[in-house]
Regions:
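N-terminal low-complexity, Ser/Thr/acidic repeat segments characteristic of secreted
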Residues: 1-160
Length: 160
């Protein structure tokens, strides 16, 4: 009888250790993601935003049956931080698009530099058309706005 109790105690102890280990791993994963998400800025590629959203969703799915309030609170804080970073990225994209659209004399090199710089600031990559040929600034502007629109659409659809 004493041996049965010792065996039961051993298995209960093992289950407890496994549960503690799982808790620590999940907590570390949330902390790691929080650290990564906090470093996101407007220059970061839009694909990274989508990757982080997918990681958060996986984590959320794995924790849906967990009743630990601390983990759920950390996950909510992580989601909130991500949404704040995403909103900032979308606002920066829309502001850059508006600035590019407001540039009037788009065929001079200063305007082309502004178009290129605004695009670069939000992670859109466009070709700098530096020649004095008329129409190149307009092409740059159209390409920048088109790319920014694609990024906005991708972020709005892919992260909601």
């Amino acid at each position: 009888m004493k041996n049965k109790n010792i065996v039961k105690l051993f298995f209960v102890s093992m289950l407890f250790i496994m549960a503690c280990k799982a808790y620590v791993e999940e907590k570390e994963q949330i902390d790691s993601l929080s650290t990564d998400v906090s470093t996101l800025n407007n220059k970061i590629d839009h694909e990274k935003f989508n990757n982080y959203k997918q990681e958060i969703n996986k984590l959320k799915e794995s924790l849906k049956d967990v009743s630990n309030a601390e983990l759920k609170e950390k996950l909510l804080a992580l989601e909130s931080l991500f949404q704040d970073k995403l909103a900032a990225k979308l606002a920066a994209l829309k502001a850059a698009k508006q600035k590019i659209e407001e540039i009037t004399d788009i065929d001079n090199n200063t305007a082309k530099s502004k178009i290129w710089a605004e695009s670069k600031l939000v992670g859109a990559t466009i070709k700098f058309s530096g020649s004095n040929t008329a129409g190149n600034g307009k092409k740059m502007s159209e390409e920048a706005v088109k790319q920014i629109d694609k990024i906005i659409k991708f972020l709005e659809e892919g992260t909601n």
